[in-house]
Curated annotation (Swiss-Prot):
It comes from Acetivibrio thermocellus (strain ATCC 27405 / DSM 1237 / JCM 9322 / NBRC 103400 / NCIMB 10682 / NRRL B-4536 / VPI 7372) (Clostridium thermocellum). It holds the Pfam family ATP-synt. Signal peptide: none annotated. GO terms for cellular component: plasma membrane; proton-transporting ATP synthase complex. F-type ATPases have 2 components, CF(1) - the catalytic core - and CF(0) - the membrane proton channel. CF(1) has five subunits: alpha(3), beta(3), gamma(1), delta(1), epsilon(1). CF(0) has three main subunits: a, b and c. The lineage of its organism: Bacteria, Bacillati, Bacillota, Clostridia, Eubacteriales. This is ATP synthase gamma chain.
Length: 295
């Protein structure tokens, strides 16, 4: 009887856990869908920024901007990294992969400055004595363009003050629902050739804007304004991709956990039925034995 009760208690515990994992899967699926819609809504705006920058570069050629100039006079350049991790676990290998990738990137640098988003990464890097910028504390849940603007206003101000010389962002790039990999992008200083490549500009590129587009007060001023918006757009995109990757990883992990719970329940149900049959057989045998003894 004790064995049967143990199986029943274990089955009850697994059913309760299954309810939790299934609920987490559904929540992650809803968040994933919402994040994708956010990115789709913002895409036309950033596409317009991109096309306008490309048009100015095509018409004006070379543009002078402080975010394009490498600080060559410095031999020992200070590097900074924006690292996007999750707020919590239960997301498969999502956090482990991005932290491991970040540590590999940091091996070649001397005391890099880290802007860590997400409690998992923040706690890890603080625990391991990395140079984490303490005033940078932003949630990664439900990323918004307003948050990306606020983040980059702080970081661009530090770059202008020469607190660091180069800036990179490390995030999880979502190639598809089944393929997600940690990635790194150099944000500052911008490289004109790389930017032209991202803006899809080459020698045969035609004018993106038809007719004679005029920029007030001048193309260079407009370009300088758009550069900051472009950088913020890249950061926003990285936050949304990381968030969708995290939710997708959690949804997959919870789906697997729910499936494993179902498998365990099937096995335990079989064990329970066998134990119950064995108990009934034992009871019948004892009754028959008792009846025979009374004859």
């Amino acid at each position: 009887m004790a064995h049967i009760n143990e199986i029943k208690l274990r089955m009850k515990s697994i059913r309760e856990t299954r309810q939790i994992t299934n609920a987490m899967k559904l929540i992650s699926a809803a968040k994933l869908k919402k994040a994708k819609k956010q990115l789709e809504k913002a895409s036309p705006y950033f596409e317009k920024v991109r096309s306008t920058m490309a048009d100015i570069l095509l018409r004006s050629g070379k543009i002078e901007n402080k975010y394009f100039h490498a600080r060559d006079e410095k031999t020992d350049k200070k590097k900074a990294y924006i690292v996007i991790t999750g707020e919590k676990g239960f997301a498969g290998g999502y956090n482990h992969n991005i932290i491991k990738f970040t540590e590999e990137c940091l091996k070649q640098d001397k005391d890099p400055l880290l802007f860590v988003a997400g409690n998992v990464g923040r706690n890890h890097f603080l625990k391991n004595k990395y140079n984490v910028y303490m005033e940078f504390d932003y949630p990664v849940q439900n990323p918004s363009i307003y948050m990306a603007r606020e983040i980059m206003e702080v970081i661009l101000d530090l770059f202008d003050k020469e607190v660091f010389d180069e800036l990179y962002i490390i995030y999880t790039h979502m190639f598809s629902n089944i393929k997600m990999e940690p990635s790194i992008i150099k944000l500052l200083p911008l490289e004109l050739d790389t930017l032209k490549e991202k803006l899809q500009i080459n020698e045969s590129t035609e004018k993106i804007v038809d007719g004679c587009m005029e920029y007030e007060p001048d193309p260079e001023y407009v370009f300088n304004v758009l550069v900051r918006k472009y950088i913020k757009g890249v950061v926003y995109g990285a936050f949304v991709e990381s968030f969708t990757s995290e939710q997708n990883s959690r949804m997959t992990a919870m789906d697997n956990a729910t499936a494993n719970a179902n498998d365990m329940l099937k096995k335990l149900d079989l064990l329970y039925n066998r134990a119950r049959q064995s108990k009934i057989t034992q009871d019948i045998t004892e009754i028959v034995g008792g009846a025979e003894a009374l004859k």
